[in-house]
Amino acid sequence: KVADSMTPDAEILEVDKKAGYMKTADAQYDLSLGDQAAVELWDKYIEAHNNQDLETIMAMESETITILGPDGVVTKGKEAHSKFLEEWFKAANPKWSNYFSVPVKVNWDEQPGTWVTNGHNLTLTVDGVESTTGNIADVYIEDGLVQMFYVFSRELPAPESADSE
């Protein structure tokens, strides 16, 4: 933020500070810091997942949500996502632990929303055995709804037990 003059009644102006770029096939667009409200929405969305609250999750995403999972699976639409989550919650009891989130604005008219890049660990419990992955999610939020996200994943080693020392 900067002032338009050095007077006591100066107007404060919002200024986008360049923070990288995004390339498409046809152009390159500047990035700047995005709206913190998008990070807060994503945190609430993850909290709803940890609580396995399908009603809240569905209220926070667009009808046409697209999810590109780390295993190459593409899920399109709320109904398909709800069905997927219902089964996954029962089978693996997933739990997320966020460790960073950054909102980014693409200065491009075709994307008026905010991207959130989020780092988190995801712990699954299948047949009593826990496994954890480190993940990065790129999330697009527009009009107060999660529109799409990509997840990139890395397997983390199992913690060493006290017996192995």
Regions found by a protein language model. Give the residues of each.
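Short, low-complexity N-terminal intrinsically disordered segments enriched in polar/charged residues
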Residues: 1-51, 59
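Short, solvent-exposed mixed-charge patches
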Residues: 162-165
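Sec/Tat-exported extracytoplasmic proteins
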Residues: 46-53, 61-65, 85-93, 126
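Short beta-strand segments enriched in hydrophobic/aromatic residues
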Residues: 61, 120-124, 137, 153
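Surface-exposed, charged secondary-structure patches
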Residues: 84-127
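Short beta-strand edge/turn micro-motifs at domain boundaries
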Residues: 1-2, 132-160
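A short gly/proline-enriched turn/hairpin at secondary-structure junctions
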Residues: 27-29, 60, 66-76, 91
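Hydrophobic pocket/interface hotspot
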Residues: 45, 56-58, 65, 77, ...
